[in-house]
Amino acid sequence: MIQRIQTIFLLFNFFYLLIIYIFFDIKFFAVTIFDHEILIEIYIISCLIITFISILLFKKRFAQLFSNKIQIFLHIIYFLIISIEFFVSGSLNFFTKLLIPIICLIFIFFANKFIKKDEDLIKSIDRIR
């Protein structure tokens, strides 16, 4: 499990979100359109749970890809909400808020790339038999 590169990218994603949740003030990352800190907490906790489940699904590559796609969807929704907030309010601190989904998306895209690479390798081995 841990020796696979996609698991390492998912662990980076997990620890990045965990560090943000534990050490940073959630009010800073809250979106002012909704003015609720609970939404950002739900976002981060759900992404943490989905990442943890994805790490545990290391033998089921399609389920791992599906859970990563759900997480990509959540990050894109958060990214769009922050972008709308920036254009509506003209806030200058949007860049730090955008770091959460951008960094997480990078980790997830790399993890998906290596999951697909493993799947292609398994398919090619099955073809050889």
Q: What are the residue ranges of the model-derived segments?
A:
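Membrane-interface helix-boundary motifs at transmembrane edges
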Residues: 1-3, 56-67, 90-91, 122
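Alpha-helical transmembrane segments of multi-pass membrane proteins
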Residues: 15-27
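Membrane-helix boundary connector in multi-pass membrane proteins
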Residues: 83-97
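Generic alpha-helical transmembrane segments of integral inner-membrane proteins
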Residues: 15, 80, 102-106
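Alpha-helical membrane-associated segments of multi-pass integral membrane proteins
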Residues: 93-129
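Lipid-handling modules and contact-site tethers
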Residues: 26-28, 55, 90-93, 101
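Cytosolic juxtamembrane helix and N-cap/initiation of the first transmembrane helix
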Residues: 1-17
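The feature represents the first ordered module of a protein
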Residues: 25-85
